[in-house]
């Protein structure tokens, strides 16, 4: 869509839309899978490397409901450690940009994890 609209490639960022799940609807902006939202979000994070089309990948998982579902935490602010874990795994799996509510903690976790990958 962006390329058809003549947006320069250097301004395109892929966002796999974690937490944005609708099973019904029409058009290209509706999820066309039969699984539940938790399975969908986990699958996307596990397979981020397969999304690479020479564009940066932005991930936004901080405080998302899938983390609350896994941890049994309904209050988003109680999901700090789950958010940091999901963000770090996302970067390991290919995310280039992280949008987070926890900038300092996420930066530290990713910095440590990256040392194990070298």
Where do the protein language model's features map onto the residues?
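Active-site-adjacent loop and "lid" segments of alpha/beta metabolic enzymes
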Residues: 1-4, 8-10, 20-118
């Amino acid at each position: 869509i962006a390329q058809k609209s003549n947006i320069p490639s250097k301004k395109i960022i892929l966002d796999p839309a974690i937490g944005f799940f609708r099973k019904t609807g029409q058009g290209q902006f509706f999820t066309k899978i039969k699984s539940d939202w938790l399975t969908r979000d986990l699958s996307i994070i596990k397979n981020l490397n397969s999304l690479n089309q020479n564009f940066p990948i932005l991930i936004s998982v901080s405080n998302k409901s899938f983390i609350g579902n896994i941890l049994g935490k309904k209050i988003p602010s109680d999901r700090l450690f789950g958010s940091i874990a999901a963000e770090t795994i996302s970067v390991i799996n290919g995310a280039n940009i992280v949008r987070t509510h926890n900038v300092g903690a996420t930066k530290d976790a990713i910095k440590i994890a990256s040392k194990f990958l070298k």
